[in-house]
Amino acid sequence: MPVLSEDSGLHETLALLTSQLRPDSNHKEEMGFLRDVFSEKSLSYLMKIHEKLRYYERQSPTPVLHSAVALAEDVMEELQAASVHSDERELLQLLSTPHLRAVLMVHDTVAQKNFDPVLPPLPDNIDEDFDEESVKIVRLVKNKEPLGATIRRDEHSGAVVVARIMRGGAADRSGLVHVGDELREVNGIAVLHKRPDEISQILAQSQGSITLKIIPATQEEDRLKESKVFMRALFHYNPREDRAIPCQEAGLPFQRRQVLEVVSQDDPTWWQAKRVGDTNLRAGLIPSKGFQERRLSYRRAAGTLPSPQSLRKPPYDQPCDKETCDCEGYLKGHYVAGLRRSFRLGCRERLGGSQEGKMSSGAESPELLTYEEVARYQHQPGERPRLVVLIGSLGARLHELKQKVVAENPQHFGVAVPHTTRPRKSHEKEGVEYHFVSKQAFEADLHHNKFLEHGEYKENLYGTSLEAIQAVMAKNKVCLVDVEPEALKQLRTSEFKPYIIFVKPAIQEKRKTPPMSPACEDTAAPFDEQQQEMAASAAFIDRHYGHLVDAVLVKEDLQGAYSQLKVVLEKLSKDTHWVPVSWVR
């Protein structure tokens, strides 16, 4: 067996150990692991570095002098004053090079052990009580980013104190600045008698590093853990337009339906949050859920928010004479059960009773739209497919999209078979085109809230039941339904996990046409009126129900809308989506 000498290094020891490893049937994995570790080049390099450092410690070298730079300058003066020969001229040139001067400066720094920064001395005219307080000097490197802290003047003591630490900012990452700390100096400038806006300007103008002289708070607050709560915003927010925010520059703007990561709820009025997917690591201020609800309640009481009556059905939801509810569901030679033109587009009158009250209950007590807590969700194999809900404005023609999707893949997609009190025709089959029931049975189911929505056409009742939707989903098919937006609240449950798609027609700008004869004026007017109605209906749905929507499709033509819808449906079972947190708990 080889013997190590006293001068053998660690890397030589590792090499010897590797060669001495012998196969062992009982410890194959352990032996293989050791062989891999000992053979790693990076470990060998580390051992060599370790040996060099140990050798340096044993030698314990001391510098010959502590001022090599000064010596070099003296030599250069002598060379410049004396008669210059070729060797002297070369030496003078070498001593003048920036690289050699830098090496000499590093030598002096190491020799003098001048590693720590020199702190500025305390001023002579210091307050008497200042000596008794613990002063902390904090130096932060913040580049061009904000400090990530807000300040205010204490009403009682008049001191400038740290009011808030923004999560993810330079101050938060340092862990050295806390809420309640008193700020005395910024880069050597006393701030005791300066206004907060002047101090903020000094902080903003400081580039690279910034030195703060602070007095720690008497009761230093513990650093709280991030809450990691995700919220979907149900409203637009611009801090520049918010007079109540304590610091507009610290505010976080966001759009409706944007997902926010709330990292701090310490303040009951102003939360700290980040936009999911944003590269900016610093959090910003947003109004808390409770504070925003109080503001909306106040505005509603003051009459600056829409009244409950304004949420009732607008003029666009009127009968469409061009479509009826008895059209067959044929497309490309295939018959698809349950497909028919929507009875909602026929002459519809809501029946009275409990269902009417249920459908209008949301209009009587409209909720205050602030935030909705959400979580990531991905469809798992063996799990029932999510319900796909289509809502559309005037001119969306949702039934065409449903027909095309189901006809293309009837094994994967399906539609709910509606109920009707209309007599069955000779070519119709029970449970295929419709579920044919008596008026008494229909009204009984209506009384027990079994219908998602219903309508009346030519004295016959039509409706879509929740059981019909459940029957399609039980077959492991994706059920497509098109409903009025009022029905969304009833469908947004963990049972259905609906994915809501808003389909709206492309609104063309008013076309410029040459002057027309009086005979043509009547034919041009309906075009503009129809465009206005379509735009108004889309705006109404977006205003009152847009916060519930997961995807928006703009329909210019059937094929284009179908292509968009197909992409959305393909991603539905593959991608991760944000859903209400109650759906996944």
From Swiss-Prot:
It is found in: Cell membrane; Apical cell membrane; Cell junction, Adherens junction. Residues 385-570 form the Guanylate kinase-like domain. Residues 226-296 form the SH3 domain. Residues 137-212 form the PDZ domain. The keyword Repeat applies. It holds the Pfam family PDZ. The modification Phosphoserine is found at S307. Belongs to the MAGUK family. This is MAGUK p55 subfamily member 3. The lineage of its organism: Eukaryota, Metazoa, Chordata, Craniata, Vertebrata. The gene is MPP3.
